[in-house]
Amino acid sequence: VATIIVTKPAEAGAALADALRAAGATVLFLPAFEIEGAADPVAARGVLAQLAGFDLALFVSPAAVRATRVLLPGNMIWPAGTRIAVVGAGTALAARAALPIASAAAVIAPDGEAAVEALGSEALWAVLRTLQPPPRRVLILRAAQGREWLGERLRENGAEVHTLAVYRRTTRAWTHYADAADIAAALRAGATIVVTSSEAAAVVLDNMVALRAAGAEDWPEPTLIATHPRVAANLRDAGFATVHTLPTLDAQAVLQAGR
């Protein structure tokens, strides 16, 4: 089996890399981003102090949940009128683990297969659009940069939408995490690369271009595994021909797709 390059960041990416190694794979963990705290924590805390003024707090990722918890006072009581919305099962689990102060709040999440994190904004919107009464003041908790699609749908539905950057994604070259020769050897042997966001797809392309330029060599076409059709489309648009879509990043499924 070819080397698997995992670009999913933070704890979830490290956990996937560990699971793949436990299943016998050779893995390079090259996270597309590192997660850092809010650029202006004082300003962020000021917004969070007004949570009671929002009828919906929307978390876009587990990282958003964890970063928000760091910013909230330890003795805070979650406002009873502020519901919580999450994009998938992973974010819902993070909310229950990191926000015990919000245990009494209503948590809105996609059900069934749509609860898979990678299905993201569209799956959550299918639930939010049916809420009665519809949310009127929404706070989206996210990274400094992110997809605007869900906020746009909420505004079209009459909501006043605010976004708060509770964390930052910092990009580092793959060579920050592994030796360039090891990465090039994996690519030369036909690596499988796991990509979990459109932003990560751009990082993968940038790193491959940089490595090719530095080594003055080319490699066979890698196999790409995307977690969302939108990510897969971005990868194909970038020129990658072999792209599989796996909404659930199960280690065995990744191994099978990479064969």
List the model feature ranges, each with a label:
Residues 1-259:
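Conserved beta-alpha
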